[in-house]
């Protein structure tokens, strides 16, 4: 076998007939498969052992030679080589065809490759290949033309007239002869000459022909190889035949398709031997052609060949295509051993880096390790006994299992794996039962809950895998989300509820105003029942000397609650004391107002003081982020476990419950509803009198009821009691919100109708009163719509993620610094008056490209080439700076990836990104994972004239990434200048906007309905909107440049996501947008050998031009183009990656004609061939590192060798020995 980790690249090409014969181990002459009685393969058949190798290991077919000692011998009786049966997976056969047959990919694809080479229309070609017309091969001295088509009647007539002075044939042999006649060099030269003058359709056709002919010229493929004289037969174990229980056989469809080819081929041979009439032979040749077409791509032409039950047979092309094809099913999605799956369950006792593995599961997964250990400890005499011991589940195996799983992390994965946190490593802990136990804080990253979710478990085997799992994948390291750098490990539900209740304050609780010397003293008072968690107490600051206190108050007494004191004890000792749930308190000591002034009475102070706020979910998340920033992984992990423990304990002991009495009632609900009904009656009257349209009536009714619900909601908010358990749940962020509360205590309001609108009849009851039957029925529509929307959204979002991953999978951090001098100027993104993304968010984690100066003092706040952390970003924003030039992925010069400086910080760690990080995949996951949170709806304007329908949510994101023409497209100016006039044209129902530029004046016709975004006298720049709506990126790149287009895509994607409350860092969107603008289209090739109209990588384009300029030639010119992500993924340099994405046959057809070479730079292509991916520890930089052992001098003398030393010694000893024997 070839070692996949050794080769650099992989090439694809057309196979010549001789190449096919050289692969083959013999010709398949008969359509038989296996003998129905003996079940042995038939001689010369599709499973022949003489051709494909023995069916049993180390044994010939007749049994004369058995055993590995006869390896390589060919049996003289049955002719079968004695070898491993594995060869039946790699040995090919072939079928010698009685007549040439065209390959359907090259004649039927779009564009038809054969048609372009011969300059014949695909329809004419089809007539020739399928024996409907003759084609003139050599016109001789007659009045016929070369490649002219003749019908049967015309052919006879010309034959009678000219005899043998011309030659015309039909079928694939005619095409083959024509292809052999093509002089590629001459054709290429002629076409290049033609291009100098040609225009329009002629030029387009010439460019397409030149492209194909040039591909043949450069690749060394011969055009005549598109027609086959013999076809390969794939190894039999790849098209197996298996016996089913009832003695029947199940076989791969390929065997049926091969049998048809062989049958027709043999019949044709026989007819040719018999000198059968021409018409019969032609018919048989046509049938052979169709049989080969069906084998290669069934259904591409005409009706597909069907098997039993009218099911189309799966041909070779279908074996590669689609989700169930070879690429996606077996190469990119292999099943692995040492894995299991089970239902998950919560275990609050685990540490953050642990998971519970059921005993029987652990025993099965770690079986080889346990067996090894049993033998090593002498508890079993050999492996077989050890296995028996495990199967019997003897008592002594459990201790060994405990020892074996120590220090061996396992990976847990939950499908769908939407981002890289969907697979994390944990240390296994043996638990009883059959369910996998998960830590409650790990749920957020997995999006797991315990209503029956299942998870898969995997065991890393090699030492390297174990080390990577522990160092890179351990759950305790994954505290920040890669998409925005905020903690993903957020406490929820009980933990939030417990900590909120713990930190609440109450007036007049027992022991209020007691002053304690130390936390221990307060704990005793609590244990004795003298104070409560909610009691406000005084505490001496010097009892916690490690903590930072305000200057001058280090020995003072400050006011807190006992609950907050307990909460603070889980923080690091030298962290600030947290008394207020504010960002200020996380970074500064306690506010001075909490301290008692000398001689001040604590009771008086408490009476005048507002109650401190309790700590909600958001604040807990902020404190996790702050601790991570200050103390890094280990301490944060401990803090999270303490937070969890405290939350659960307090929540359990607090006695928080819900009963129906906790749902308050409001007295005047009926009056509010009656008032709304009156208003609705008024509106209906207006409609009946014809004063308003039906649409207006509907909108007004909806608005009245929404208003009514808001009034009820506000009343409920007013009667919120801070001690009410439901209020506590909603306010703390543990579960529910005010809207749920309104439905319980107020009214449900309007329901969604099945058509997507709103029903005019509201549900006026609430859940406490109970709904009427009609109201219940109306509610079901909304519920169903919610479910269907979610299901559709998941599919759409998943497909978007797949396309994003595919287009960016080869973007890897490849170097430290690309040395670019360009940068991206960023400012806050706004929409009207609304802030979409503040400048601060755009600066954190990025390098400055130029120094940042204070706008007033002009001092340098931040020099160039510095990574901005949060403190620096705050400093810049607080100084009043509105725009900063940063290093950006857009302007990075690195080929096939990005450099560290242009990318900036790795948001998941808060440190510099490392070389080898697969930032493309991370970006795709970060954009795709929140896709399900976006809405599916296109918001319509409710009939308000002027505003175009705007697309939002997921459809808008897809529209941008696919670079489609947007809905509600804005007209943009193509010149920089002034708006001289805006005139209406009533006849045409349009407005005319005139822009006067420096050199020319442009007039734009816009429809009446469009809202004009400019006024007369306004100054506009190229690419500015003249009407409201979305800009078409393809137009923008034509009018402006690539960078402007990239900036537009970035800001629009951010708008789509942030409107829905989803935060994604800019850099992820930048990586995607850059991939869409990687190509240029050649306008004029200059003196390069590039073809006009060709798409090529910017990097390659620059390299080609550099060569020409150095040699003093004229460089090529090109224009930037924007490709949608699907198109960009298919245009990648790797044919393996493109073929495994979509349109497999088209990609492979094109790649083989061009003789493409896949440089294996991305992740997918390496996964496909089974090579280690070139990212992370798979980067060449890391793979070439050698571990260096530092040994003190005196130790060295004690003959401690590294393996390398031993190998050197052995080699030297061998050399000595050889030398001695030579002498």
From Swiss-Prot:
Gene name of the record: rpoC
Protein name (database record): DNA-directed RNA polymerase subunit beta'
Pfam family membership, one: RNA_pol_Rpb1_4
GO cellular component, one term: DNA-directed RNA polymerase complex
InterPro entries, per database record: DNA-dir_RpoC_beta_prime (IPR045867), DNA-dir_RpoC_beta_prime_bact (IPR012754), RNA_pol_asu (IPR000722), RNA_pol_N (IPR006592), RNA_pol_Rpb1_1 (IPR007080), RNA_pol_Rpb1_3 (IPR007066), RNA_pol_Rpb1_3_sf (IPR042102), RNA_pol_Rpb1_4 (IPR007083)
Task of the protein: DNA-dependent RNA polymerase catalyzes the transcription of DNA into RNA using the four ribonucleoside triphosphates as substrates.
Positions with a binding annotation for Mg(2+): 449, 451, 453
Metal-binding recorded as keyword: yes
NCBIfam families, per the entry: rpoC_TIGR
Cofactor comment text: Binds 1 Mg(2+) ion per subunit.
Binding site for Zn(2+) 2: 818, 892, 899, 902
Needed co-factor(s): Mg(2+); Zn(2+)
Catalytic activity: RNA(n) + a ribonucleoside 5'-triphosphate = RNA(n+1) + diphosphate
Family (UniProt): Belongs to the RNA polymerase beta' chain family.
Alphabetized UniProt keyword annotations: DNA-directed RNA polymerase, Magnesium, Metal-binding, Nucleotidyltransferase, Transcription, Transferase, Zinc
EC number: 2.7.7.6
Subunit record text: The RNAP catalytic core consists of 2 alpha, 1 beta, 1 beta' and 1 omega subunit. When a sigma factor is associated with the core the holoenzyme is formed, which can initiate transcription.
Domain of life from the UniProt record: Bacteria
